[in-house]
Each structure stands twice: as structure tokens, then as C-alpha cells.
Amino acid sequence: MVDEAPEVVDAATTERRAAASSNAKHYMKSAFISMVTLTVATKATDYFTGKEEPVSCGLDVNDNSWIGKRYESLRYFNPKDTHYNTQYVAMKDGVDLAVDTYVADYIVKKNQTVPTILYATRHGRGYTLDFPFSLFTQYEKKFTNPRTNVYVNRFVTNGYAWVAVDVRGTGASAGSKKHDFADQEIEDGYEIIEWITKQPWSNGNVAAIGHGLEGVGALLLAASKHPALKAISLNGAPVDLYRSAFYPGGVKNRKALESYSSFTYDTDRQIRWREIPTLKPRIMMNYFGGNIYPVDDNVAKFKNYIAQHTNNPNLTNELLDLKFRDDKLKSVGVTFEELDILRHLGDIASSGVSIHSFGGYYDMGVARSSILLFQYLTNTLDKDVAALLPKLPEDANTDPFNHRLTLGPWSHAGVDNSDPFATSKQKCFYHVDEISRFFDHHMYENRKKFAKVEEEEPIHYYTVVHSKWKSAVTWPPAHLSDQVFYFGPNQAIEEVATPSGELSIDVAHKPLYDVESRWNMINHLFGIRPFYYNDRQQMEEQYAVFQTPELPLTEITGEVELRLFFSVDKPNVNLVAFLEDVDYQLPFKNENKRRGMTYITEAVLNPVHKTISKDSSVQSFLKKDSREIKANEVYEAVLKFEPISYVLKHKHQLRVSIGVATPKEFGNAGEEVPAKLTIHYGGEYPTSIKLPSFSGVFMENVVPKVADEAADAFEAQAEPVETVTAPAAGTEEDEFAAAEDEKDEL
């Protein structure tokens, strides 16, 4: 081994090394500061824009399906190899409807046949693309269909034909609409289905799909009773258009109505919608494309058809003075009942069509509508509700397993997950997968073994806080019972009758928060999901607030009912009530917690609409079942909260906040609005709230089935125990661990 000579370092070298070391430390420090600054800035930006870190969607993550994985169906064809055709199909009266067909190239070339999915829309079957974006389309025709592209590719790949139709008086079709959802659409739908069955690629079986208000159009197809129509999938369809969309509780949903009318007015006239609520779609509409796509190069014909659309009535104008279901539209001469699909429920039930309806808890009143449709089809309606609807035909198949109902924590048409407890607020549920399963079951006999729909109960509903999917055969689920609480002094809600008293508030006619609510369906479609601050303490300033004591672990599933005795100093009022979860408990370790006040659900009502009888909780919203509200007189009003499934954790409290619906979403009830609202309780005015509930958390219907030890842990929560032991923050105790209380009185 040779010893190395020691290095000789002069002063200059030492100085350079010292400087380099100093510079390295400086750069490292600067880099560290930059990284920290960038991280803080990014986090701050994400916070203020609502952006959160994505999560991996596995079983039991957010709203992910009870299956826990994607349903793939059977993939036969490459979506790039799709035969696309657009053409006019003439109706019997000579009116041309624009029809697009998508079929796998292989099916066309080999003269094979497949079932068809029909999509009838008044929002445009396709849109133009501006140069240079027109260079990058999948098809020879230069257009895009962003609202349905995922569905088209999925179903064509899986062995279906897809047919999109601009309904009469819209898109590129000819004619005009007497009004939305007129009976003419039923006749047109029958003819389109008949045309489909005669195409060389059709095997004679048809399904239909409809999202949002297009779902009402899909139900009109069922009302045609064409024998080829086998199944329909609805997502966010307000079946009761009056109560679930435009007049919840008889209160005009002004914002949704105006947005819908503005959108349809522009698209009917080949105008790119001018009121798009978010920046990205607005830029895309202005610079990428967005006009309705024409069928052919006949410009004169296209302009003529667009001109015919100007005869379509404007829904906002037509409903300007409308208050009751049986009021007539301003110029059309029909009542609102003739817009509502409820008038055709009998024909839909006797058509034999199987229907899968998705309803979002935070999508206007759509969950209630979806439940109503399922209950009607299965003959399980409350007798008072059934009396207001067409009689169920004797030939209707009322087997609940013939239909499906899925209720989840979604905004309008399932666009977003609005569960306040969802990790990263990320949607993990793929509606297209469940729709695919449903259609595979009904349209392909040999796919039933893959779809496995027959192995499941027909109802699936998601329980917020518990974050589990559950199943049932009837609605409401059989394990629930009603629990009544009474309002009383000191803004308390008690289990027993209370002394008489009253609480008055000064009415604030201003929006509570500058955030999105459940009622603006068009904004939901552009990714603005309903958002409610978790700490709603400031509501006390303008709402009458009542609160329960600490409660044991409780599941609430269904429609909460508020029987309210009130008076106002002016005759016109729209009432609103919020149900809230109050949590000021110490957190458990790893608890998914929202400390403060969390929104559960809400109810609105114009109290001129009384119940159909004194002991009923059902309103008809007809003129004959109305009353005049006089100043300073006490009235009883029944407010039905929008359906929800929610778990109230151990020692949480329920709060009810009552006030006047603000004009941000709703129109005023009249010219003279109240300045003072009084809530009366106790004695002859027993204001109360009725909860469809279960003491503890019901585990037997959780899907997939939980392990026995987990079920035992949950079931133990309903059992009374002897001592009180408040869990300290940071302990290992499960947030749903057995509730320890001196006595479980509920």
C-alpha cells in the first residue's frame, strides 16, 4: 500500500472553498424557502378554490359503489371504430327530427343486430367545433358531444347502438313546442322507437336514458307504451316537476327556473348560452365551439328550422304569476299539471318498462321524486299521496324487483359528491357502471350472470356520516320507527309535551351565505356543487333556532316532518327550515369530524298550501286546498324535509332553524313581505318534529355485508349502559363505538 502525499492547500483555494460552501448553504436555504413558499401558496390556492387532494376510490371510500370496483360489462369493440350517421327522420305530420346513430363498424359491416339506447334531448344531440379544434374529432363530422361522449363510447363498445334525437322544436329538429313535455313528445317518441326497430342494426329491443329534465322526456317514451321499450335509466329526474324542481313546497324556485329558461331560449335560437356560470366552460363555449350541430349542409333548411323554434314559449314568462298546480300558464292555456309527467304515471306503470331511478340527497327535491316513482310503480304509496295520482292500472307489474332505486349524496344528475364528510369531496360512484349493469340485465339475457342484479335488493341508499351503502325492498326501510320531539321554552326541543310560549325574530330578507345551494340545478351541471358551511352559528341572527339535548347514536332515514305553529305580521311568507347536526364533542382518534354545525337537510313551504285534511301531512298544491294567510293570526303548517339518510353520532344534538326563504333562490310570496316571524309552541300550539329513526345504527342491511365483529360493535351502540365515560381526544376509541350513557331514553 502506497501512502498518498498530503494535499497542499493555499490561501486562495481555502477562500474559494469557503465561498462555495457558503453559496451552497445559501442556495439550499433559498431552495428550501422556495419549496415552503410554493407549498404554502399551493395549499392556500387549493383552500380558497375548494381543491383537495384526490383519493383512491376503493370499497367504502366516499360514495363508491357497494360492489367496490368498476363494472366493465363485456367489451367487444374499439370505440374508435364507430359508424356515425346523422339524418332527418320525418314524423307523420311531416316534421323532421334530427337523429344521430352510433353503431360499431363491425356490426354494420357484418349485418349483425344489437339493442339500442335512445337518448332524447332538448339540449342538443351534438355541438359544433371551431377551427382548429375541429381537426381533432373522432368522427368525420366536425362536432362534439361532451355531455354524452362517455356513455356513447361505453355502450357502443359493449355492444349497443346509441341513438340521440333532438326533440321537436329544439336543436336541429324542425317544429316548435306547445310547451315543454307536451303529449306530442309521446307520439314522436313512439315513431322514433318504431323507426329504430326497422333499422338493419337493431335487434328490436330499446332502452332509454335521461339525465335531469331529460329524464322526464325518457318517461314520456315509456308513456308511449311501445312494446320494444324494455328499460329506462333516470338520473336526477324531477318526476314531480312542480314540487321537486320549480315549486318546492309551493315556493317558486326562481334561480333554477330562470337559468333553465335562459339556457333553452338561447339554444333554441342557435345562440351560445350567454350565462354560463363558470370560467372554463364559458371559454370553451366562446372559443372552442358550442352551436347546435346541423344535420347536413342545407343552410337554408337549417335556418328555417331554427326560426320555427322562436315560437317556443319562455317558461319563466309562462310561470310568472303561477302559484298552484292547476293554475294556467300565462299564454299557452294549459295548467302546470299538463307539464308534469305525473299525469302519465298510469301508462308508465302499465307499459311493463323496468325503471332505474337515481336520486341525489342534495339535488333539489329529486330524491323525493325518485322515491315517489318507485312507490307508485310498486304500489307502496301512502294512501293520501296515492289519492292525488292516477289510479294504478290492474295490469301493472308491482314487483319491486322489476325496478331499482338508488339514493346517494349527489348534486343535480349525480355530477358531484356533496357529502360534507367525503374525503377530498371526491365522487367515487360511477353512474355509468350501474346504468350499464341495469341495461345488461334487461337487454342481454346472457349477461345477467355478470350483472348480478337479481342477487340484490332493488333499493340502495347511502347513509351520510356512516358512509355505508344499505339495501332494502321497500321505502322507507322496515327497521325505522317515528320519534316525536316537541319545541319548548329556552329554544329547547324535548321528548315530552312542553309549556306554551312563543319566540319571535326579525326577518332578514337577504341570502344567508354567498354559496351554492341544492336548488340551482343548472349551476350543479357546471361543477358548482351544493356547499353549506359546517359552522352555521351565525344563523341564530336571522332564524328562530331550537335545539335538542345531547342524543344517543341515532340513524335518521327518510323524510323528517315539522308541524309548525306560526304567525307573521304580513300576509305573504315563504317558510324555510334547516335540520342541522350540532357537534361540540372532543374528537376520537382518526374520526372524520366536522366540528360545529353541519347541514343535514331542509324544507320550504308557502303556507297558503294546507294539508288535504287536518290529520294528514300531504299537500296537493291545488287551489282548492289553499287558504289565505292573515297578519298576526296563528296557523299550523306541515313542512316535509327533503329525504336523507344520516347518522347522528353519540352526544350530538339536532338543531332546527326556522325562518323566511331568501330571494337568492326563491321568489317572494307576495308584494308585502313580513318583518316579524313568531314561532308558537306548547299547549294548544304543539309545534313538533317527527324523525323516522333507529336507535343506534342498523347494520343488517349494509352492503356488502360487514364482518360479524364489526356488526356487533355497531349494534352495541343502541344498548343502555351504566356509566358515563367521555372519550378523550386522541384515544383509540372508534367514532361509532358503543355509546356509554347512564340511560338510553330514546
Predicted ranges, named:
Residues 420-722:
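C-terminal, loop-rich substrate-recognition/catalytic regions characterized by aromatic stacking residues
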Residues 108-197, 417-423, 663:
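Cap/lid segment of the alpha/beta-hydrolase catalytic domain
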Residues 352-359:
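Catalytic His-Asp charge-relay segment
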Residues 138-141, 145-152, 157, 223-350:
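Accessory cap/linker subdomain of secreted extracellular hydrolases
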Residues 184, 209-293, 359-364, 380-388, ...:
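A catalytic-pocket lid/entrance helix-loop region that shapes and gates access to the active site
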Residues 40-88:
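An N-terminal hydrophobic leader/cap segment in hydrolases
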Residues 68-112, 550-552:
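N-terminal cap/lid segment of alpha/beta-hydrolase-fold proteins
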Residues 364-371:
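Conserved alpha/beta-hydrolase "acid-adjacent" motif
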